[in-house]
């Protein structure tokens, strides 16, 4: 692929490189504040990202693979997102309201064999044809499946992490797949690149700066 000079350098717009940068330049600054008051610095965020990435490697995930995330807005969802993108894998979040045919359609179209799922949502998977989905990391509890293999939440964050990125991740690589609402038919899978997210941010939220919390 011919590199277009209008595209920012990967270090400026690809999430994994940004986390690594801030872990050096702003190591002790707060990066994330969770519900309940727990905080992660940028250094801690990189450490946890690398641990989650290693957990996915141990499940066979590699660059370009699609992995489903069916969770509320919580720590495990952040770990799933950041860990996958650190590998260059594709984060595929699912609306927590989905069930039945809507859920089945999204799971099958996602082309994912692995999911990270909140225990409260897991029983709905027994009511659908899950396609090539075979393994589920269950967070916040346990779950039993008819045709899927359940894995404990501890598999998401092993004791040690990767020492660095395993592959080069480019601005035009797919960062995540977002499904449309499905109001005019089955939900469509929208492939969003790192560059798309980088370009959209300042346009959508021009009033946010480094001192804001979102």
What are the residue ranges of the model-derived segments?
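Short hydrophobic/charged patches on amphipathic alpha-helices used for structural packing
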Residues: 20, 53, 103-104, 166, ...
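A short N-terminal helical cap/helix-turn-helix that marks the beginning
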Residues: 9-31, 47
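ANL superfamily adenylate-forming
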Residues: 122-171
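Short beta-strand->loop structural element characteristic of the AMP-binding/adenylate-forming
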Residues: 68-70, 77, 81, 85-116, ...
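Conserved ATP-dependent adenylate/AMP-binding module captured primarily in the ANL superfamily
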Residues: 96-127, 198-214
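Conserved adenylate-forming
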Residues: 56-61, 159-172, 177-214
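Conserved AMP-binding/adenylate-forming core of the ANL superfamily
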Residues: 30-74, 78-82, 99-104
């Amino acid at each position: 692929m011919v590199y277009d000079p209008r595209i920012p350098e990967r270090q400026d717009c690809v999430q994994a490189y940004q986390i690594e940068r801030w872990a050096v330049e702003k190591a002790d600054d707060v990066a994330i504040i969770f519900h309940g008051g727990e905080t992660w610095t940028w250094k801690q965020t990189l450490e946890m990202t690398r641990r989650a990435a290693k957990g996915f490697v141990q499940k066979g995930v590699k660059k370009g693979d699609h992995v489903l995330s069916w969770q509320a807005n919580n720590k495990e969802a952040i770990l799933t997102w950041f860990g996958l993108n650190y590998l260059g894998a594709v984060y595929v979040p699912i609306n927590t309201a989905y069930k039945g045919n809507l859920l089945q359609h999204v799971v099958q179209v996602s082309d994912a064999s692995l999911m990270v799922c909140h225990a409260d949502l897991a029983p709905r998977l027994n009511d659908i044809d899950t396609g090539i989905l075979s393994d589920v990391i269950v967070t916040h509890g346990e779950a039993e499946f008819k045709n899927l293999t359940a894995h404990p939440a501890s598999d998401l964050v092993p004791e040690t992490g990767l020492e660095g990125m395993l592959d080069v991740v480019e601005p035009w690589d797919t960062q995540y797949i977002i499904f449309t609402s499905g109001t005019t038919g089955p939900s469509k899978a929208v492939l969003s690149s790192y560059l798309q997210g980088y370009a959209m941010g300042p346009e959508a939220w021009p009033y946010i700066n480094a001192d804001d919390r979102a």
